[in-house]
């Protein structure tokens, strides 16, 4: 959470200290979020997905980019009426323009990826990198595989 604040977040919500759904509802005066990006991996996935749906306001979008354990995600019809749930992160037209914009933000220095990189692995150690991300998601923020070390 401290890194999010250091990188310019207007408000940081620590789900270990407060109910994230209630916090988002309070911040939006009860109307809910326009966009929730679900980028959670590992065993927290299904619960975070449910919370993401609960944070959405009418006509809001939940964008799924995280991977989780092989459990079905609950999609109650009452929670998805007048809301959008988008899955995927590559290969869609909107995805390509998003990548282009992300590269522009990185190149201009508006996004400091170096601060968000917590671990670097040689590509030959990719199994260890994925183990860290999957089994210890709270210990890593950004993990890079390097080919030219």
Task: Please annotate each region the language model reported.
Residues 12, 85-87, 116, 120:
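Conserved beta-strand scaffold positions in the cores of enzyme catalytic domains, especially
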Residues 88-93:
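Active-site PLP-lysine loop of aminotransferase-like
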Residues 19, 46, 50-53, 58, ...:
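C-terminal hydrophobic helical "lid"/dimerization subdomain
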């Amino acid at each position: 959470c401290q890194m999010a604040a250091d990188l310019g977040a207007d408000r940081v919500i620590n789900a270990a200290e407060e109910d994230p759904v209630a916090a988002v509802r309070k911040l939006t005066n009860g109307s809910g979020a326009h966009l929730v990006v679900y980028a959670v991996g590992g065993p927290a996935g299904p619960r975070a997905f449910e919370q993401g749906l609960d944070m959405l306001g009418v006509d809001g979008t939940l964008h799924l980019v995280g991977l989780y354990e092989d459990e079905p995600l609950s999609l109650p019809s009452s929670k998805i009426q007048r809301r959008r749930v988008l899955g995927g992160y590559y290969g869609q037209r909107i995805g390509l323009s998003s990548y282009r914009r992300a590269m522009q933000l990185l190149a201009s220095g508006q996004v400091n990826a170096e601060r968000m990189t917590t671990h670097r692995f040689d590509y030959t150690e990719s199994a260890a990198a994925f183990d860290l991300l999957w089994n210890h998601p709270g210990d890593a923020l950004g993990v890079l595989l390097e080919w030219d070390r």
